[in-house]
Amino acid sequence: MSVRPFESPPPYRPDEFKPNHYAPSNDMYGGEMHVRPMLSQPAYSFYPEDEILHFYKWTSPPGVIRILSMLVIVMCIAVFACVASTLAWDRAYGTGIFGGSMNYPYGSGFGSYGGGFGGYGYGYGYGYGGYTDPRAAKGFLLAMAAFCFIASLVIFVTSVIRSGMSRTRRYYLIVIIVSAILGIMVFIATIVYIMGVNPTAQASGSMYGSQIYTICSQFYTPGGTGLYVDQYLYHYCVVDPQEAIAIVLGFMIIVAFALIIVFAVKTRRKMDRYDKSNILWDKEHIYDEQPPNVEEWVKNVSAGTQDMPPPPSDYAERVDSPMAYSSNGKVNGKRSYPDSLYKSPPLVPEVAQEIPLTLSVDDFRQPRYSSNDNLETPSKRTPTKGKAGKAKRTDPDHYETDYTTGGESCDELEEDWLREYPPITSDQQRQLYKRNFDAGLQEYKSLLAELDEVNKELSRLDRELDDYREESEEYMAAADEYNRLKQVKGSADYKSKKNYCKQLKSKLSHIKRMVGDYDRRKT
């Protein structure tokens, strides 16, 4: 169910030149126009409330969030491995096991800063007066990788096991907030890590910059290292490949969290726009995937021909009884429509009787209507909404299947409209088509507004039921109203109106195409 209005044909405005809507007569412009071909839309092109969202697929917004969370988990493990592989050099600095070799380069240049760096891990942190400690930067990035790993694992697990919590708007709001916080923190941790593992980046412009460059210059100039290379000093001055990979993965994690936020917002919008009965969280197998048994089918056909179906006139009488419902569900009088516009051809008895069913009748049970248009239900329905915060599918009795027109296809409708509205041959005929278009458009809009009011009310009640506590008075009242509107929406009157709207749309599209063809012929 959609809260947005049904799709409407564009208004007829001959004073505006819009090639994708209407091509006005060439006489209005006094010049030559180049108009794109205008194609008529099919009668049943798109109705939002008939759209089904398959959220169980990996290509849907929730499925993309699952994929991104899985990628974040893998990248967090890779960041942890890359950063942890370089911790050994920092541990050696802190213990001062190479104190003899370290004191020579540092003692000569920085003897007055920190006592000659007896312990290198602490010397540059305190003796330099505020440089970023590589161990602190690496610890910060490791901590953020751990937090991101835990958060992404929770998101992935709750989505894969299809828990009730992961099917609510509140869940995706939490995902948005957590992803935003973690993305910002990972960005800060990555910047700090870059400063920690690259001493020349933080030394530029400081009072100790020249000393840092002097120490590390031997590793930046080719052939200047000599025979002896201090491995610990080398890893301090040069960014290791593992550290570079960790930096790249840090920015990739930020991008992944940004995409998670985008798809979480899209999921919330779709959940606000569509009813829960239009969202499939689990893949449902309606038909059994079994090879056809021709022998059994012949037996069923021969055995089933003994029973006579109800007369076709009874079927037509049940369908052709339109009544106008208001938004509150009360009957406000009858409204007659032309029988030729929405009347369905009678159901062929042989076809209806000879088709074998592989499922039980209860799986396709629909509300029944008597000849006097009163709704008959097998039993009194209880509220079909679940607990607040849980996304529970509506009772299958309430599912609405699209109202069909029997054997009348779009091509047959087009032939009918072509007989009623043949190609235009004169300007007077064009003006007549314009008046018919305007009158039909007004009726189309008013009827769609009446149907859309029921859809909006259902969507509002659907959101309210998620906020109420089950078994409360507000919940029961809202559930009763929700079920009543679902019955109204499943009634034959609502479906006949909906079918009439679709055929009106086909009529308006045909008129628009005829006018467009006439205008193109005149150019």
UniProtKB/Swiss-Prot annotation:
PROSITE patterns referenced in this protein's UniProt entry, alphabetically: MARVEL, OCEL
A GO BP entry: cell-cell junction organization
Biased composition annotated in UniProt, kind: Polar residues: 368-381
UniProt-annotated stretches for the region Disordered: 1-20, 302-338, 363-408
Disulfide cross-links: C216-C237
Biased composition (Basic residues): 382-391
Keyword Disulfide bond set for record: yes
Regions annotated as coiled coil: 433-489
A molecular-function term among this protein's GO annotations: protein domain specific binding
Protein name per Swiss-Prot or TrEMBL: Occludin
Organism from which the protein derives: Rattus norvegicus (Rat)
